[in-house]
């Protein structure tokens, strides 16, 4: 298996922008990568304001929104609760099997979870259980501001305790006027967790274009470090890297 599992310290931190941007940059570099968000609550998959639609636009994948996100519900609750209230049951095996189907089309997949690792996800699993099934290296997306050191270090410790590899952290929503504090938080996260912060993605105010996001990802995220993970995974699997 090749790719990344994108998780976060909380909801509304910037996972979708980060996942879509990194996937879009990798596709521009010639990698055959896809995006996958198994469950989405808050919007149905076809809603242009939803995560599946944003992933499609930013990544530039040919797959449709309902293929990127096969299970979606409009109510903005934790996925397990939202599905239960709608009378729907989704099991861990279903979303894992779908992942394996997508791998027939793509060499690598960037998988976005929901909220953080302990979020109730399918009927029988938390987000972290799904991450353990895939065994992809994690990218942890976190806020750059007050409180982020605690949240990020706890997320990394929880992931490591479950045997998962954390490729790095990306602080999303960095404002120029706060960069001194952001840099201090970056250094503290690295010191306390032993995991590198691979990017300080700027805050996007108002409407933004795909081009703006991808250019920012190229400038502010260490894409070459992420490339090393993809290439190493592909070499272990005996598969081509592009």
Swiss-Prot record:
GO-annotated cellular components: cytosol
- One Pfam family it belongs to: AAA_26
- What is its biological role? Catalyzes a mechanistically unusual reaction, the ATP-dependent insertion of CO2 between the N7 and N8 nitrogen atoms of 7,8-diaminopelargonic acid (DAPA, also called 7,8-diammoniononanoate) to form a ureido ring.
Reaction catalysed by this enzyme: (7R,8S)-7,8-diammoniononanoate + CO2 + ATP = (4R,5S)-dethiobiotin + ADP + phosphate + 3 H(+)
* Location of the protein in the cell: Cytoplasm
Note the InterPro entries from the entry. Answer: DTB_synth_BioD, P-loop_NTPase
Q: According to its UniProt record, in which pathway does this protein act?
A: Cofactor biosynthesis; biotin biosynthesis; biotin from 7,8-diaminononanoate: step 1/2
The UniProt record gives the binding positions of Mg(2+) as 16, 51, 112
Q: Which residues bind substrate?
A: 41
Protein family per UniProt: Belongs to the dethiobiotin synthetase family.
EC number of the protein: 6.3.3.3
Cofactors per UniProt? Mg(2+)
Keywords assigned: ATP-binding, Biotin biosynthesis, Cytoplasm, Ligase, Magnesium, Metal-binding, Nucleotide-binding
Q: What is its main location?
A: cytoplasm
What residues does ATP bind to? 12-17, 51, 112-115
Q: Which GO terms describe its molecular function?
A: ATP binding; dethiobiotin synthase activity; magnesium ion binding
Q: Which residues form the active site?
A: 37
Give start-end of the signal peptide. Answer: none
Assembly: Homodimer.
Q: What is this protein called?
A: ATP-dependent dethiobiotin synthetase BioD
Q: Does the keyword Metal-binding apply?
A: yes
Any Gene Ontology biological process: biotin biosynthetic process
In its keyword annotation, does this UniProt entry include Transport? no
């Amino acid at each position: 298996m090749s790719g990344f599992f994108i998780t976060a310290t909380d909801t509304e931190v910037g996972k979708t922008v980060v996942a879509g941007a990194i996937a879009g940059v990798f596709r521009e570099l010639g990698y055959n990568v896809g995006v996958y968000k198994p469950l989405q609550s808050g919007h149905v998959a076809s809603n242009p304001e939803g995560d599946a639609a944003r992933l499609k636009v930013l990544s530039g994948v040919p797959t449709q929104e309902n293929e990127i996100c096969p299970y979606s519900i409009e109510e903005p609750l934790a996925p397990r609760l939202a599905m239960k209230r709608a009378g729907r049951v989704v099991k861990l095996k279903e979303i894992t099997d779908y992942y394996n189907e997508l791998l027939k089309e793509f060499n690598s997949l960037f998988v976005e979870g929901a909220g953080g690792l302990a979020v109730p996800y399918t009927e029988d699993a938390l987000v972290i259980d799904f991450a353990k099934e895939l065994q992809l290296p994690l990218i942890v997306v976190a806020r750059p501001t007050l409180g982020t050191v605690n949240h990020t270090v706890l997320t990394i410790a929880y992931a490591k305790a479950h045997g998962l590899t954390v490729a790095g952290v990306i602080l999303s929503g960095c404002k120029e006027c706060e960069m001194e504090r952001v840099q201090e938080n970056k250094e503290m996260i690295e010191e306390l967790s032993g995991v590198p912060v691979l990017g300080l993605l700027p805050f996007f105010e108002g409407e933004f274009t795909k081009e703006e996001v991808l250019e920012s990802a190229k400038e502010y995220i260490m894409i070459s470090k992420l490339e090393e993970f993809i290439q190493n995974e592909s070499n272990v699997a005996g598969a081509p890297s592009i």
